[in-house]
Amino acid sequence: MTTAALADTSNKTVTFAGAVYNIQELGDDSYTVLKAGIPVGRIVLSFGAANGVPEGDAISEDDLTLIGEAWFEAVG
């Protein structure tokens, strides 16, 4: 069973698997994902699909992609 990711655009966060990730804009459709102030990866919207790019092993590509899907759906 996959855990749902919940985006909060007013606080610029996504809650996923019991953790809160801050979302920081880098540019058009490109964001840094931070956990406790430490960058764990990036999310990018490319051709209508969310893509997660981990920076290290703190989070998987699949989990970042789920965070990205929730974020991009919320921001429209």
Regions found by a protein language model. Give the residues of each.
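Mixed-charge, Lys/Arg-enriched low-complexity segments
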Residues: 1-8, 44-76
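Short, isolated positions in well-ordered beta-strands
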Residues: 20-23, 40-41
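Short acidic-hydrophobic surface loop/beta-edge motif
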Residues: 10-16
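Acidic, low-complexity, intrinsically disordered interaction modules
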Residues: 28, 32-53
